[in-house]
Amino acid sequence: VNAEIQAAILERLTGGIAANLELNVLWKGVNGTTGQFDGFGTIIDANANGNVNFVATPVALTVDNIISKVDALIAAMPIAVKSATEKPIIYMNQLTWELFMRAQIAAGNGWYANLGPAMAGLKYMGLYEIAVCPGIANNTMYMARKSNLWFGTWLTNQMNEIFILDMKENDGSQNVRYGATFYAGAQIGLTSEIAAYGPGLS
C-alpha cells in the first residue's frame, strides 16, 4: 500500500474514532461498556446527591421555555465561578441549540436567524459561550469552565497504536486491514463548579 493510500486510510480511521468519541462516549459513555469510559455527563449525573449545582425540577425543553431554562442554568452556577477571568461555557446538543435559536428568532432577535455559521464565537448576554456538543442528551445542559473538564490519554504507552496491514503478502488479495488501540478517559476537576439541567430527561 503506497504512502498516499495509507495516509488516507489513517485520516479516515482517526476521524471516525474522534466522531464516535464525541457522539457516543465523551459525554454519555459508561465505563462498564466495552470500548467506553465514563463521560462528563455520566460523571456529573452520578453526583446528584453531591456538589453539582443542579437546576431544580427540570422539565422537557421547548421553544417556549428554553430561554428561561438557560437563565436558570446560569443562575445555578456559583457567582464566584461566573466572576472568574475564565468564564464558564454552556454545553448543549444540536436539538437544544435549535430550540434556543428559534426562541431568539420568535423574540425578535433577527440576527440569530441571519448569521448562520457566523454565530460561532458569539456569547449569550455577551458573557457565556454556547458550545454545541452532539453527545449530550436531549433536555440536558451543562455549564462549566473548560479547564474543569479534563480529557486525558496515555501518549507514551505502547498500547496506543494505529496500524495498517497489507494482506497481499498473506493471502494474495488486494485488501488491507486496519485498527487502533488507545487509552482515554474523562474527569471533572471540581464538581462544585458545575451547573446542570435535566440529567435523566429524554
Where are these regions (language model features)?
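Helix N-cap / beta->alpha transition motif
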Residues: V1, Y91-T96, A144-R145, G189-S192
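Ordered core of a single globular domain
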Residues: S68-I105
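Alpha-helical scaffold segments that mediate packing/assembly in large oligomeric complexes
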Residues: V1-A75, Y197-S202
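Sequence/fold signature of self-assembling virion shell proteins
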Residues: D38-N65, M101-S202
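Short secondary-structure junctions and interdomain/linker hinges
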Residues: N20, N24, L73, M77-A84, ...
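Extracellular structured ligand-interaction cores
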Residues: A8-L10, T85-K87, N175
